[in-house]
Amino acid sequence: MLSVVEYAVHQLGVKHIIVCGHYGCGGIRAAVSGRSFGLIDHWLQPIRDLARSQFDCRECWSEPELDRLCEDSVAAQVERLARTPTLQAAWGSGKEVSIHGWIYGLQDGLLSNLGCTVSQGD
């Protein structure tokens, strides 16, 4: 997946990367379920770690809490992407690239900017 970002930034000159999550995410629900899902557990672990650091451990999650975890996960992914060698090299060479975190509401169709943009020098 990072090869796509590298190609977009270094070859195509993409200036904006959007990390977009969505409310009602099955991955978020799976991560907090306490169950193992085999190979995808590797992808769920960062969400589990985030949930543990942001919320008290629990078995029941309210919809607003799950929504907030969706938002927090997007913000964490923006930060993680900003730390990759690909983006660090792009910024180091003077490329103007911004990473934006957005969230999509499946119920209302609204796309919202989470305000967690990272750009060169941030």
Named regions from a protein language model:
Residues 1-15, 26-122:
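Divalent-metal-activated hydrolytic enzyme cores
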Residues 19:
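Conserved functional hotspot residues or short segments at active or partner-binding sites
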